[in-house]
Amino acid sequence: MPFDPRTTPLTAVEARVLATLMEKARTVPDSYPLTLNALVTGCNQKSSRDPVMEVSEGEAQEALDSLRLRTMSVQISSARATRWEHNFPRGVGVPDQSAVLLSLLMLRGPQTAGELRINSERWHRFADISSVEAFLEELRERSEEKGGPLVVLLPRAPGAREQRWAHLLCGPVDVNAMAQPPAAAGARGDALAQRVVDLEAQVQQLQARLAHVYAQLGLEEPGQSS
């Protein structure tokens, strides 16, 4: 039966647990699958999390058990320890690239397509922003037979240059409320944050171009010599 977040949405803890498993599988494969303790640490880390959460071991275990019933997590038992891995793409019914984008939205909150491309660098290298947008559009246009949309494009926030995307795995969202900038941040702070994002995107593009040039010339990139 297709996953339908409108009738059986994930809880906030389930979303954090599932996305953390996906993240660690991509970024620290040598430590994956995860023990319960490692998973809780990943769920509660301060970096790359919005919102920051305080998930207990009991809450994480309950979420894992619930996700397993939905075929979204898998328990691997051994003599040394019980570990867990995700079954995100198959459990939700989406390709790997879409699972990456959904996980980032669950971990970091609403983001623009450009931010998603930058933040996914260690997970999956999308060719360009258009590629990211294509997968997002597929998720937004997911048919009713498959369980309906999994993302929504938020209205442009005041002063913002681009619209942000939000996931729907935890059910419907208040798109107008989510589109508003944080109350504590002023327009100047928003503009600065956007400028940083733009600069990071430019740096990523320049690095990719330089790597391509070095590869074409058969040269070794600086700092990579043995």
UniProtKB/Swiss-Prot annotation:
InterPro entries on file: DUF480, WH-like_DNA-bd_sf, WH_DNA-bd_sf
Superkingdom of origin: Bacteria
Signal sequence, start to end: none
Gene3D superfamilies assigned to the protein according to its UniProt record, in alphabetical order: Winged helix-like DNA-binding domain superfamily/Winged helix DNA-binding domain (1.10.10.10)
Pfam families listed in its UniProt record: DUF480 (PF04337)
Family membership noted in the UniProt record: Belongs to the UPF0502 family.
PANTHER family cross-referenced by the UniProt entry: UPF0502 PROTEIN YCEH
Name under which the protein is recorded: UPF0502 protein Daci_5373
Organism this protein belongs to: Delftia acidovorans (strain DSM 14801 / SPH-1)
